[in-house]
Amino acid sequence: MNIKNSRARNALMMWCGVVLHDTKCALFRILIFCTGCTVLVGPIQGAEISQTIETVKASVVGVGTFQQSRSPAMSFVGTGFIVDDGFHVITNAHVIPKILDSEHMETIGIVIGKGDDTEFRPAVIVAEDAEHDLALLKISGAPLPALKLGDSGLAKEGQSFIFTGFPLGMALGLHRATHHAMLAAITPVVMPALDSRKLDVKMIAQLRKSPFSIFQLDGTAYPGNSGSPLYDPETGVVYGVINMVFVKGLKETAITQPSGISYAIPANFARDLLRQKTQ
């Protein structure tokens, strides 16, 4: 680049943050601190992510129960998301209540809508995978927009994801919130116990098997996020299902003093569960 006009050269330096190392050389060696590039790219990426989130939110639902004699009649404690044909929902197994008040016709289902404009859709349990903390529901009514389950084996440590759900369930109402998370590690599901007295029956059972791998995330999730889709911010493809957080001390501190460490079940286990609907 041969710049003869010093004014033009100075203007270029001011605009692009260019440091010229040798003004006598025909081809200048330059060091560019050009923030203009990030200004151009940033908003485009932000717009793409915003569009992805809006698309995904249409498939994210609350998972809970309905009981006419109860106030409020609708109650949800976790999150789920629509997959496959628009009639199936993936969530965590621990979100599904083990006992229903059948005497008062309590029903499992999903909650859709936003804010005060909500609708309850009854659902039935199609399949459940307690080992991987997953459940598959089938809803009635019209189909809803479905998300695609990706190959979680392709996920890499350091990859950025986002997840959408209802962090505190009913406490914040039916307002979907989205959070960033980085895949910090792919680790065995059984976390080491420094004290053998802290091992429970479930942990011992897992240790006797070959522990499957789980996604450890550098991101803050809350109890109501259980069942939230963990997805690619550009494509919306789901690679995991949020299922637990690392708790420091008592369970209550998961809300008041979150550790910032969350976990997700790889989506391949959800894909396996989905295949059971046709068996």
Positions of predicted regions on the chain:
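Bacterial N-terminal signal peptides
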Residues: 28-39
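N-terminal secretory signal peptides that target proteins for export/translocation
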Residues: 1-25
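Beta-strand/loop subdomains of soluble extracytoplasmic proteins
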Residues: 104-110, 115-123, 157-162, 176-200
